[in-house]
Design a protein with these regions (language model features):
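Catalytic Walker B motif of ABC-type/P-loop ATPase nucleotide-binding domains
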Residues: 765-769
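A short, surface-exposed alpha-helical micro-motif characterized by mixed small hydrophobic
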Residues: 806-808
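Transmembrane alpha-helices and adjacent helix-loop boundaries
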Residues: 15-18, 22, 41-44, 91-126, ...
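Conserved ABC transporter NBD signature motif
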Residues: 667-674, 687
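The feature captures the beta-strand-to-loop junction immediately N-terminal to the Walker
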Residues: 644-646
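Helix-to-loop junction immediately C-terminal to a conserved catalytic motif
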Residues: 659
Length: 822
């Protein structure tokens, strides 16, 4: 028993040391650049192939081949990626969404390129750099960890690295060469990736898809380390590796045996799932940037051409449509990304899980019920599983959400699709009468048309506008009354249903369930393809499906991945291309109006009927620093109340407590007799509390009228004239109402934001520095509007630094100092 424990521990240390190298590389790269390098596994795979090429094919000695691979090629690839891709992105603002798209593009490009160069098959003759004993690997890991800790803590470069991590712009102003720091980080990260690939290749399948996925799984150790601590990453990797090895000795009897064995063989996947779904996430931004998902106006002729191309196989192809039947099914799967990522802006890398589950459930159920009924039931069963990724999306943003969705995909692949207990003996048959490829293809086209119409209706309607608002500006959407958490769940559930429908059709068309068709690497490829062809465009999904299927069928394996990866990299690197396309065929702007008339609000309820918003003893602290120290404030109806004070006085914090975006530690917020302290922002909006933002919160992808309409729809205003009245009041009733909000002048955008707030017919209006960015004439116009609103009985609170504006409009002025009103 002791000998077995020792042997298993050694095996676990071997795996854990490779995982530790990955963790170190990811942490150092992230600390130096702010980029979570999802292409780490692909770099590892390329280096493993390069070493094999040098040693096995070209008969180089191992030592010089390893030196060239690890000390020249791997760091050189890292520096190349930094200089050509990620450094320009950091100069342009380091948008996490664009960086993620570029990183996925690099991953897919390297995987596709490797498949092109070396073929998609597995290789079993990779050279071993060290012996089978783990001590050599452990020594390398310990030495590298000690080097990283020493450099980061006790050298000048370490101080520069910490400065860049804390504030890259300020570090550059302080004379630090941030580009050099980033290049060193990328070189070291690529070196550890190459070393990981070289060490793992002799013991696993060396193929373009398997090895990158293995490295992706051990991202868990970097997440556990919060992307900051090399020591924590190394310790976590070694512990998980040893625990995974020890679990292989468990052989419980009964139905639990396959599951226990699966967990024992995939403990890093379990760790990734827990780290991604339970531990606090990394990343801050929640949505794909608007330039990345920008919708291109599609002329009717393009739809006509697409329809003709999809119908061509029915008339001109032979009876064997094996390739063609994949296109409509895959297009439906990719439509799920149009809903979730394109319209909703949520980064989802796990749609392969839902597509595969749709195929799997269809196969299971078709053994008992007719095939079409089995497909329908599969869709209904898989749709609620969208909550697995939708729930984390409520709290997780950006990179954290990407990791959560990727973790769900990896776990589903390892614990369901790859297990014999789930897929052994599974066959899929087509419905009666659809055995012929032509008939089946025609049914697929009909279902694709229905799916396109359903998604088009969703995008054009109230829900579609709310999704676009959530994508463009989540806090602004909440302020407009959009129930963002519920809407995210809806997007992921609808996306799961579409993916399940497409997955079921795809496997029925091929008459088999192929786990490889739904592996996580393919999910990254699907995501990249949809982003490349326009994530918010309905035509993008069929086009991406045709591109992927056509290239894979008509060319050497890997062409589709390489092409899509290159295009995704370029889209992440040059998002302006999508921005230019989004302006295509946009109607010309009308000439600017020479004057804007401000209309009085129509007569409304008596002012006495409006509830009073009040804060009672509100306290809030950040650690030991007290921001609000028992603040009392009332915002009475029919009056303009102003809140002024110096920077750091607590004005904005109190404002957020009133809006619902912050919850106080003590005290309460009341609206009339109701205690609304615990109510979220969108719920307060629906009570009649509207707000604007210091930094303008409009939805650039929507027109001016759609921006205002969201305020009425989400505020549940039943009067159809509410939108028109708000547009007229703010001087937006002319041709400007049909223009997208993107690119409009600041003064116009301020009026759009205020018009959206007023369209909800609020009782109380909260304004955070509403005059910011306005010229004198625009500020005077704003003052007239606010006085008119108060005269009509509305309660108005203004947080403002412009004391002239405050003196002009305020009935009551409160001064804040050090978290108190006095």
């Amino acid at each position: 028993m002791a000998s077995l424990t020792y042997d298993l521990t050694l095996a676990g240390l071997t795996v854990g040391s490779a995982a530790a190298l990955t963790g170190m590389g990811l942490v150092v790269t992230y600390r130096a650049t702010g980029v979570l390098n999802l292409a780490h596994g692909a770099i590892a795979m390329v280096c493993a192939y390069l070493l094999r090429q040098l040693v096995v094919e070209w008969h180089w000695p191992l030592a010089p081949a390893a030196a060239l691979t690890l000390l020249v090629a791997a760091p050189g690839l890292g520096v190349l990626l930094d200089v050509l891709v990620f450094r320009p992105l950091s100069v342009q603002g380091n948008d996490p969404a664009r960086t993620l798209v570029a990183s996925i593009g690099v991953f897919v490009l390297l995987v596709g390129g490797a498949a092109l160069l070396w073929g998609p098959g597995a290789r079993a003759d990779a050279p071993a750099l060290v012996t089978g004993e783990p001590w050599g690997q452990l020594a390398v890991v310990a030495a590298l960890a000690a080097l990283v800790v020493t450099v980061t803590r006790w050298t000048r470069f370490g101080g520069e690295l910490r400065a860049v991590v804390d504030n890259r712009e300020l570090a550059a102003l302080g004379g630090i060469d941030t580009d050099r720091v980033a290049s060193v980080g990328w070189a070291f990260g690529a070196f550890t990736a190459g070393l990981t690939g070289v060490l793992l290749a002799p013991y696993v399948r060396l193929d373009p898809y398997g090895l990158p996925l293995l490295v992706v799984e051990v991202i868990a150790v970097a997440v556990i380390a919060r992307m900051r601590s090399v020591v924590v990453a190394v310790v976590a990797a070694l512990l998980i590796g040893v625990a995974q090895a020890q679990l292989t000795r468990l052989h419980p009897a009964g139905r639990a045996e396959p599951l226990v064995q699966a967990v024992g063989a995939n403990l890093f996947v379990v760790a990734l799932l827990v780290a991604a779904l339970v531990l606090p996430g990394v990343g801050t931004r929640d949505a794909l940037s608007r330039t990345t998902v920008a919708a291109v106006r599609i002329p009717p002729a393009a739809w006509l051409v697409a329809g003709v191309l999809l119908l061509l196989p029915l008339g001109f192809a032979g009876s064997d449509l094996h390739t063609s039947v994949q296109v409509p099914a895959l297009a439906i799967v990719l439509l799920s990304l149009v809903v979730v990522s394109g319209r909703g802006g949520q980064i989802s890398l796990g749609q392969t899980a839902f597509a595969g589950l749709g195929a799997l459930f269809t196969g299971w159920l078709s053994q008992s019920v007719p095939e079409l009924l089995a497909l329908l039931l599969a869709v209904l069963l898989v749709a609620p599983l969208g909550l697995l990724t939708g729930r984390p999306a409520i709290r997780r943003h950006g990179l954290a959400l990407a990791l959560a969705t990727l973790a769900v995909s990896v776990a589903t692949s390892r614990f369901v699709f790859a297990q014999p207990y789930a897929t052994s003996g599974l066959t899929l048959t087509r419905p009666a009468g659809l055995g012929d490829d032509r008939a089946y293809y025609a049914v697929e086209l009909a279902l694709l048309a229905c799916a396109l119409l359903a998604v088009a209706a969703l995008r054009r309607g109230r829900t579609g506008r709310a999704l676009a608002a959530m994508r463009d500006h989540e806090e602004g959407a909440q302020a407009a009354g959009v129930p963002v958490p519920a809407l995210k769940l809806v997007a992921f559930v609808v996306g799961a249903a579409l993916a399940a429908l497409g997955g079921g059709l795809l496997s029925m068309g091929l008459r088999t369930f192929d786990p490889g068709a739904y592996d996580p690497v393919r999910g990254l490829l699907w995501f990249a393809a949809v982003v490349v062809l326009g994530a918010d465009n309905l035509l993008g999904a069929p086009a991406a499906a045709a591109l992927l299927v056509g290239l894979d069928a008509g060319t050497r394996g890997g062409v589709a991945a390489a092409a899509v990866g290159l295009l995704a990299l370029l889209v992440g690197r040059f998002p302006q291309a999508h921005e230019v396309l989004s302006r295509w065929r946009r109607p010309p702007k009308p000439p600017p109006a020479t004057a804007r008339k401000v209309y009085a609000l129509p007569a409304g309820p008596a002012p006495a009927a409006a509830p009073e918003l009040a804060a009672h003893g509100v306290r809030l602290s950040y650690g030991s620093y007290t921001v609000l120290a028992g603040v009392d404030l009332a915002v009475p109806p029919g009056r303009v109340t102003a809140l002024v004070g110096g920077n750091g006085a607590g004005k904005t914090t109190l404002f957020h407590c009133l809006c619902g975006t912050l919850r106080p530690d003590a005290g309460r917020v009341a609206f009339g007799a109701a205690d609304i302290t615990r109510r979220p922002a969108h719920a307060r909006t629906r009570l009649g509390i509207a707000r604007t933002f210091q930094r303008i919160a409009v939805f650039p992808s929507l027109t001016v009228e759609e921006n205002v309409r969201i305020g009425a729809e989400q505020g549940r205003v039943r009067d159809p004239a509410a939108v028109e009245q708000a547009l007229r009041l703010m001087g937006l009733a002319g041709g400007v109402r049909r223009l997208p909000a993107a690119g409009l002048p600041t003064g116009t955008l301020r009026r759009v934001e205020l018009g959206r707030a007023l369209a909800g017919r609020p009782h109380t209006l909260l304004l955070d520095e509403p005059a910011a960015g306005l010229d004198t004439a625009e500020a005077e116009e704003l003052a007239r509007v606010l006085r008119a609103l108060a005269a009509d009985g509305m309660a108005v609170l203004v947080v403002e630094h412009d004391l002239d504006l405050v003196a002009d409009i305020a009935d009551t002025v409160h001064v804040m100092r050090a978290g108190r009103i006095g």
